[in-house]
């Protein structure tokens, strides 16, 4: 029985991304809850995908909604929302206004509206930060993304490359 297989090495996969111009992989260590390290790691001047750990993962400290709420609270204060796209408008402590998307939400119509928005974005200013869980590996590409912040232990480098692929 013939079973076709397609294999790529990391170079081939990364080389195939349309917008990826360079790649740097860094790491940060934290003790306790990862949320305490977010303020020193997150650069709100850069377009960032934050990939939170799986709820059953060792680095998860609360349910996924609480983790998202804590990340947003770390960024600043929610001052509004775009109900048609489910983008939160967040004011940072220094007064900067950021547009934050939440793909962790289980509400299907809400998540689909945000995913559709991500596919239609045609401006760098359309989004500043995107928080995701499993969808960080599939379903959208964000050409203006500058940083992927992946929290916790991942099963493989392949999973990390898949997440990086959303930002290409």
Language-model segments: residues:
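Short glycine-/polar-rich loops that comprise or flank the Walker A/P-loop
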Residues: 44-46, 143-147
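Short secondary-structure boundary/capping segments
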Residues: 12-15, 66-71, 145-149, 164-166
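Interdomain hinge/linker at the junction between the two RecA-like core domains of SF2 helicases
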Residues: 2-40
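Short, solvent-exposed loop/turn and secondary-structure capping segments
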Residues: 61-62, 141-143, 159-162
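Conserved C-terminal RecA-like helicase domain
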Residues: 29-138, 154-155
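Conserved SF2 helicase motif VI
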Residues: 155-168
């Amino acid at each position: 029985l013939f079973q076709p297989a397609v294999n790529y090495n990391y170079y081939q996969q990364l080389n195939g991304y349309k917008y990826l111009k360079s790649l740097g992989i860094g790491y940060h260590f934290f003790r306790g809850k990862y949320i305490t390290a977010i303020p020193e790691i997150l650069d709100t001047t850069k377009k960032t995908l934050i990939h939170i750990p799986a709820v059953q993962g060792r680095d998860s400290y609360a349910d996924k909604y609480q983790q998202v709420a804590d990340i947003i609270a770390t960024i600043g204060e929610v001052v509004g929302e775009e109900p048609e796209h489910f983008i939160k408008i967040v004011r940072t402590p220094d007064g900067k206004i950021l547009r934050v998307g939440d793909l962790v939400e289980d509400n299907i119509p809400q998540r689909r509206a945000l995913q559709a928005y991500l596919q239609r974005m045609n401006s760098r200013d359309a989004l500043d930060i995107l928080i995701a869980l499993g969808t960080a590996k599939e379903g959208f590409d964000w050409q203006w993304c500058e940083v992927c912040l992946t929290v916790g232990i991942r099963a493989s480098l392949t999973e990390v490359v898949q997440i990086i692929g959303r930002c290409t």
